[in-house]
């Protein structure tokens, strides 16, 4: 596993991209409505991609395999916000996918919840209960494995897909504990209809670990490398805008279709900007399921603006 991870994130520096004509990139974006799924939309609205000579075609997915599969098949150039376990598994099987940047470090945004009448108030109450995560290999899969190992409990883990569908399953009694990321479920929590029983931030070991990455198809790396460099630079610029421009919250409230106050809470309380840095990929010391010791640590040379490196060196 250590060798696999070391190879997987062998990011190699390349020269900064020169100005070029508009080039199309097809991008899969997971979980529309999440704060970190809006950065491509920001880049389009602000004209950043146009300035960089890029046309972006977006495919929105529910995350996990639905994001990773099309990039492996080659129908998509880039897949955003992939759980690192799923990417490692795909690479280990020889799939044509490579990490191009970190996406999320730490797990401040994810949480697990239950209905108050269920009697489940903390993770320790979940022995034999059904506890949700989005999909195998996703970041919620990784976080939940760490949480249950830390709490020493034995729930039944269930892949439930996206946050809206998971909420429906909890409210209808199909599962005991759901997962979410803001702004989803915040209103139900405020209304007392649900209670948080665990947070990703409860796992100290994840605070400095990359849990999600952005990846590209191998052929895209070979044929569109210059465009991928420009894409990452625009992504970095869009993230900066989202944390500095006063209109960012209004923009997000409109996209997520939530009140402005919930949009503000989502960004300020659950998505610290430093967690969304792109240049440094860090890995776990031990695999959460096998216990095998692994280590990933790569810091891209960001002297050319923080996104002049695209990884493939395999």
Ranges and model annotations:
Residues 51, 202-207, 272-280:
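Short, solvent-exposed loop/beta-turn-alpha elements that line the ligand-binding surface or hinge
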Residues 14-17:
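N-terminal signal peptide c-region/cleavage motif recognized by signal peptidases
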Residues 23-164, 169-172, 176-182, 193-199:
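Short, glycine-/small- and polar/acidic-enriched structural segments
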Residues 164-255:
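Pocket-lining segment of extracytoplasmic ligand-binding domains
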Residues 293-314:
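C-terminal solvent-exposed extensions
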Residues 1-7:
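Bacterial N-terminal signal peptides that target proteins for export
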Residues 19-21:
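Signal peptide processing junction and immediate N-terminal pro/mature segment
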